[in-house]
């Protein structure tokens, strides 16, 4: 289905992308993975999406999310994209794809049978003059150190896509300012753009991972002071809430 939460951005939940590479208990879309069908977003056809964007000229961005749209076969994902591209919507400027594929299955664009087809879909977007932003989810610096992740990032960037990173702040996993500083620096080194530090929302079985907001702000402040301006594109600590994104400034 669709969610028009922000004036300029429509969230799109393709029905075939409502599972994920991982089942994180801190995920704020936990209901989608535990059998609560009435809370799932689903849509079988892409026509409604292109029609909606056409009828709402204020919309410039579409975020493909889930679940994870990158668990879909390239042919299925490409069909959604082609519906949008064929509609030639003048107000559509950016397509975003929220995914954990880089950290959990970089082979999606390396060795999967349809890896090149996936990359071709990315190229069709950028060749159309539409900005493509891969919203890559990483939880820790170590996820960025493997050769396969580095190769996948390179492949994606060669299509003209830009990779922006977003990460949740998690007790027992990454609640360390030095790690965050190193992770942002590594992301810049690999050609990615640090984008968000998230705090976990009050959904699902996330209580084990939650970090108090005061400490979250301290971690962010200490980390941001250790990096150059190129990594200070990151925003946080942030939370997606009913009014939109809420950021703690102090």
Ranges and model annotations:
Residues 1-12:
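N-terminal [4Fe-4S]-dependent radical SAM core
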Residues 9, 30-62, 72, 76-79:
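Conserved alpha-helical substructure of the radical SAM core
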Residues 11-13, 63-66:
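Short glycine-rich or small-residue beta-strand-to-loop segments that form or flank ligand, phosphate
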Residues 13-31:
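Local cysteine-cluster metal-coordination motifs and their immediate loop/turn environment
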Residues 22-26, 35-39, 147-148:
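A short secondary-structure junction signal
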Residues 47-54, 70-209, 214-215, 219-227:
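Conserved AdoMet/S-adenosylmethionine-binding subsite of the radical SAM
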Residues 60-62, 92-95, 130-132, 233-237:
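Residue-level recognition of the N-termini of beta-strands and the immediately preceding loop/turn
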Residues 218-250:
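C-terminal accessory regions of radical SAM enzymes
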């Amino acid at each position: 289905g669709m969610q028009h939460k922000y004036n300029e951005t429509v969230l799109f939940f393709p029905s075939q992308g409502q599972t994920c590479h991982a089942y994180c208990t801190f995920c704020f879309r936990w209901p989608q993975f535990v059998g609560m069908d009435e809370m799932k977003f689903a849509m079988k056809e892409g026509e409604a999406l292109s029609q909606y964007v056409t009828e709402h000229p204020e919309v410039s961005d579409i975020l493909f999310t889930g679940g994870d749209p990158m668990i879909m076969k390239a042919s299925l994902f490409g069909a959604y994209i082609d519906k949008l591209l064929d509609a030639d919507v003048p107000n559509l400027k950016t397509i975003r794809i929220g995914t954990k594929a880089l950290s959990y299955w970089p082979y999606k664009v390396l060795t999967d049978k349809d890896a090149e087809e996936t990359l071709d879909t990315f190229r069709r977007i950028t060749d159309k003059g539409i900005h493509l932003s891969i919203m890559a989810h990483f939880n820790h610096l170590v996820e960025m150190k493997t050769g396969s992740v580095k190769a996948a990032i390179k492949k994606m960037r060669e299509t003209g896509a830009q990779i922006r990173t977003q990460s949740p702040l998690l007790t027992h996993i990454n609640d360390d300012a030095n790690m965050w500083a190193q992770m942002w620096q590594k992301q810049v080194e690999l050609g990615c753009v640090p984008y968000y530090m998230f705090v976990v929302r009050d959904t699902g079985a996330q209580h084990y991972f939650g970090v108090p907001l005061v400490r979250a702000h301290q971690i962010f402040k200490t980390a941001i002071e250790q990096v150059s301006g190129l990594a200070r594109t990151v925003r946080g600590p942030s939370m997606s809430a009913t009014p939109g994104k809420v950021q703690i400034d102090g």
